[in-house]
Amino acid sequence: MDLDPNLVINHDDTNLSEASFTMEQHTSSYSDIHMGSTPCTGHRKVDMWRNHNFDSGFQTMNHSEAPSIISSLHPSSHLSGMSSMADYEPIPTLSDQQKQKFDGITQNQADGQYNTVRAIPELTMLMKDQDNEVVHKAVILMQNIAKMECDPMRRQNEARIVDPRVIFTLRDLLRDKVEFPNIIRCTLGTFFHICNRQEGIDLVTRAIAEQPDIIPNLIRHIGTYPSSIYKYAILTMHSILSDKQRGGQSVIIARQQDAITHVTPWLEAEKSEKLLPVIVDLIRVLCEKNTEQKIKFVKMGGPQKLLMLLQHRVYENLLWRTTQLLKTFSNFDAPNLVAFGGRQILANLLSHGSPRLVQSTLETLRNISDVPSKIKEDLLLKSLLELVNSRNTTIRLYSAQIMSNLVANNRHNKEFMCGNNGVVILVRALTIATKEMGDLRDKEAQQMEDYIESLICTLRHLCVGHPMSDKVQAFVFRDPALFLHKLLTMRPVLLKHTLSLLLKVVSQHALLAPFRSCRIGDKGFVEQLIHILRVACTQLNVQESIEGVRVKDIIHLCIQILRWITRDQDILNEVVFFLQTPENSRMGDGHTLPIFVLQKANVEENTKSSALALIYNLMHHEQMANVLDRDDVLVKMLQNVQMQSQTHPELASLANNILKMMYEKREKTRNTLPRYNSYLESQFGHMSMTTPRSEALNSSGEVCEGAGEQWSTPLTDDTMMDSYCNSSGRDSSKPYNSPMYHSPPAMYPEYSIGPPETYLDPHATASCYPRPTPPQYNSYDRSPPVYNDLPSNPGPSSHSSDYYPSRNSRF
């Protein structure tokens, strides 16, 4: 295209220059001729339109309130929303002598491309002229070229501004012409239009690599208010720094030059809702993955300024970008965001019609939802209850996660949820999600599992910590099969949280009836709990965690639940039955599951405390008490724990209770026998016999009293003796090698002593340990078939079901 030195194309897209008007005239004439009308017809229509009283924004350049669609597609059109008549660039009037300097830039209709290429070096030289009027005019023409190149309607296939000397000359103008705002403004406008094309970005970044002082000169003018110079400086900086291919080095330079301190004040001072998103995004680029910049932004009150934008602005693009930036600081400065009322301000955005804004808001809220606050969250909780059943999977997931954090350890929020049908909504959502889970695969299934996990967590929090907790527990457990299904799926994350919820529920005695009666197929809660416990025990020495869930936590929760539910006699009978099945009674060296847990040195103290409490409850079952009474390893462990009353009083007290119960059981037998154990008499003779206690077995090599059939003479040499009285045939006089709890070597070593011969006997059913029958069946043959055809001693990990299914195989 030819350039006329007397024509000016302003920086603003909405301003038509004389050149563009001339082009419009030629276009109109061409169309009129081919459409069968005269050229003057088009001119007359334009004149009539100009003389009307209404204003479309074309004459006064006042942009409309609503942003145009093109503003989201073409960056240069952002200028139209930030201009006014006061910002018009005055056309410099040149003298004849000054005009002669532009004679080299000719106007040729036949070869416009040649003259454009030729004009660039000429204009580059004129921008270095000593006459400021000439420089001003040259910069305006260079800006016109840059603007036409970035316009998709008029751009050529190849960029014309490709010489780095143009960039260096523009840099010199920014440095040397500070006192001439018109020149600075056009220079920055030229920079901006060059950067609107990828070839221009590459040119500028290459020039910055050679001479990095381009960035400091741009930053210098971010604070220049006259003639809206700061707008073009900010837009140009944003274009350069946000380039993903070459902007990294420029970002480093901008951080070194403290650009964040120049940009942040405009969050409060700028009024244009079209420029503010650019400012917010520029701050995001500067702060991204850089702690030092984030600290500077926080010290300048940046997060508070962002919250003010959310509170008083309505432009969706601005709100979305602001929440995106706040999301960065929600992990960096969450307590201050909450203290400044961030959760209340963000809650107002959850009713917005933009899905991306709602999702970004929820993500920010999720990051700050775990911060304690005394401010009421009623509006936020109400909005979350509406969104938790959203069709958008991400929105409902974030909503459930936020609710889980808000109700944890917050009595007011729990009461609000219970008083506003929150429990009903959550249970319904959990039921629907469980039904949909089976049809999903891979990523969708993973997201649904996270959603279900959050729902269960929220319900678990609501089951305790407020006056209506009993009613909540009863309502949640109205459909116990919903939670039994979670246990049967054996997904580690869901297992942990479901077990945690069940632990709250079984604390209420009235709910033990549905717990006992609920079944899916032939599986009930007790059977599945013991199965999960066995699987976890087999994995205890193999791996510490499975998919982020600690194996120790699963063991602890199972032991805790078994401890609570064995208060019920019917459930106790069922627990004893499943604990005595071969796969559960032959763990390690041939011990039942609770004893196996006690043997493990890497199990935590609270788990061992629960295991001891479970054993105490099991001692109330006559058949199980006989089994435990014969276990020499258990007796030795209890004796060692009992001696540590100074360091571990709770464990010592539990061990003491079990030993006293054993002793009382032996005393009942002792009254009918001529012999008694002198060791037990000396150990527990001073204790009261009124409280159920337990006792250790004889370790002196004398005749064993209380367990099994009594013999008048020692039968240790009898080859048949072990088949009838297992406890007296075992060598129990070996010294225990660790008197201290949790000190090397471990207090509960995994003994290498072989299992009793009874367990190795292929005809084990004929031994003194008859196979028990659960309370709900009349005979063992009618009990669940899963245990009917098991090998005599398969070992702790020979079953394929002993391992949690991997996520890949599950989904």
Curated annotation (Swiss-Prot):
Null mutant phenotype: Abnormalities in vulval development due to incorrect cell fate specification, resulting in the following phenotypes, multivulva (Muv), protruding vulva (Pvl) and egg laying defective (Egl). Mutants also show defects in Q neuroblast migration, uncoordinated movement (Unc) and reduced superoxidase dismutase levels. Mutants can be rescued by wrm-1 and hmp-2 when expressed from the bar-1 promoter. Double knockout with dpy-22 result in reduced body length, male tail morphology abnormalities (Mab) and dauer induction.
Lipoprotein in keyword set: no
Gene Ontology BP, a term: cell-cell adhesion
Tissue: Expressed in body wall muscle cells, hypodermal seam cells, gonad sheath cells and vulval precursor cells.
Region annotation Disordered: where it falls in the sequence: 763-811
Polar residues biased stretches: 795-811
Subcellular location: Cytoplasm; Nucleus; Membrane; Cell junction
Keyword terms: Activator, Cell junction, Cytoplasm, Developmental protein, Membrane, Nucleus, Repeat, Transcription, Transcription regulation, Wnt signaling pathway
Consequence recorded when altering G524S: In ep486; interferes with neuroblast Q migration
GO molecular function: alpha-catenin binding; cadherin binding; DNA-binding transcription factor binding; nuclear receptor binding; protein phosphatase binding; RNA polymerase II-specific DNA-binding transcription factor binding; transcription coactivator activity
InterPro entries linked to this entry: ARM-like, ARM-type_fold, Armadillo, Beta-catenin
GO CC annotation, single: membrane
ARM repeat residues: 108-147, 331-369, 370-408
Phenotype for L482I: In mu349; suppresses ectopic expression of mab-5 and interferes with neuroblast Q migration
The UniProt record lists the keyword Nucleotide-binding: no
Chain ranges passing through the membrane: none
Stretches the record annotates as Involved in transcriptional activation: 1-85, 541-811
Complexes and interactors: Interacts with apr-1. Interacts with axl-1. Interacts with daf-16. Interacts with lin-23. and. Interacts with pop-1 (via acidic region in N-terminus 1-44). Interacts (via ARM repeats) with pry-1.
Entry function: Participates in the Wnt signaling pathway which affects cell fate and may regulate the stem cell divisions of seam cells during larval development. Functions as a transcriptional activator but is dependent on the interaction with pop-1. Involved in maintaining lin-39 Hox expression and regulating glr-1 abundance at the synapses. Required for mab-5 expression during Q neuroblast migration and for oxidative stress-induced daf-16 signaling.
Family to which this protein belongs: Belongs to the beta-catenin family.
Protein name: Beta-catenin/armadillo-related protein 1
